Regions:
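Glycine-rich beta-strand-to-loop/alpha-helix junction loops that act as flexible
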Residues: 31, 165-174
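A contiguous, well-structured pocket-lining segment that forms one wall/lid of small-molecule binding clefts
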Residues: 80-165, 175-188, 215-218
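Conserved phosphate-binding catalytic cores of ATP/NTP-utilizing and phosphoryl-transfer enzymes
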Residues: 4-26, 210
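Short beta-strand scaffold segments in enzyme catalytic cores
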Residues: 12, 27-29, 35-39
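Glycine-rich phosphate-binding/hydrolytic loop that grips phosphoryl groups
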Residues: 10-13, 195-231
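Glycine-rich phosphate-binding loop plus the immediately following alpha-helix
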Residues: 5-8, 19, 42-86, 110-120
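Conserved phosphate-binding/catalytic loops in two-lobed NTP-binding clefts
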Residues: 3, 165, 181-207
């Protein structure tokens, strides 16, 4: 019996996509359940550098998509809507942008979108925005998430001295995020590795991490159980 760390599996999918060793690297896992940065010395040795204080990025995408009256899953729906919007139409907050903490927060951003849609009295039932307003809100929200993630990746690359960023999780399929991280890595002289979209969400390639444990003779006891919040 071999236990596989779901989060480590997302980074390992980058190794399979690259077809070569990618370690050591900075790992960013950005999904509906996780938003965290890791120092990855090898496939099985990961040190948490920082995570989110509240919502994960993917969770924020889903919640804001609901506020805007878009479909589920929220990530793809919001990305499609943002494609025709102005990312500078609304100045939404980027948490922790003025300090070096490798932490994320998306709850305040979500609330800012809510107030931009409905004003301060959000208890009243009002229809979701439509047309250009909705597209601009989606684009401005997406830009804020991308900026926050890219900034902390740049800070983490400088902090660790690593020259490779591996990114996994469903949100990493977002084209705007890929472009933002590519620009950040170029400025830092670092290599960016992101799997194709089909390997960003949960997939069987992640379970291939079990091969690394098998090679090392690392097996789990028969009473192994799932740990939903394990990082």
């Amino acid at each position: 019996l071999i236990g596989v760390n779901h989060v480590a599996g997302h980074i390992y999918a980058c190794r399979l996509a690259a077809g070569r060793d990618i370690y050591p690297c900075l790992g960013l896992v950005v999904s509906g359940g996780h938003t965290a940065l890791f120092r990855c010395d090898d496939a099985l040795t990961m040190t948490l550098l920082g995570g989110t204080r509240d919502d994960a990025a993917g969770e924020a995408f889903d919640k804001v998509a609901a506020i805007l009256g878009l479909g589920f899953p929220g990530g793809p729906a919001l990305e499609r809507e943002a494609a025709t919007g102005d990312p500078k139409a609304f100045k939404f907050p980027r948490a922790f942008s003025d300090d070096g903490r490798l932490e994320f927060s998306f709850s305040g951003l979500k609330t800012a979108v809510l107030y931009a849609c409905h004003g301060q009295n959000v208890s009243k039932a009002t229809p979701p925005p439509a047309g250009k307003l909705r597209a601009d809100l989606a684009a401005s929200f997406q830009a804020a998430v991308v900026d926050a993630l890219a900034l902390k990746c740049k800070q983490a690359l400088r902090h660790t001295g690593l020259k490779r960023l591996a990114v996994g999780g469903g949100v990493s399929a977002n084209k705007a995020l890929r472009a933002g991280l590519a620009a950040a890595c170029e400025r830092e002289g670092a290599e960016l590795i992101i799997p194709p979209a089909e390997l960003c969400t949960d997939n069987a390639a992640m379970a291939a991490l079990a091969v690394e444990k098998f090679r090392r003779g690392e097996f789990a006891p028969a009473d192994l159980d799932a740990v939903p919040n394990f990082l």
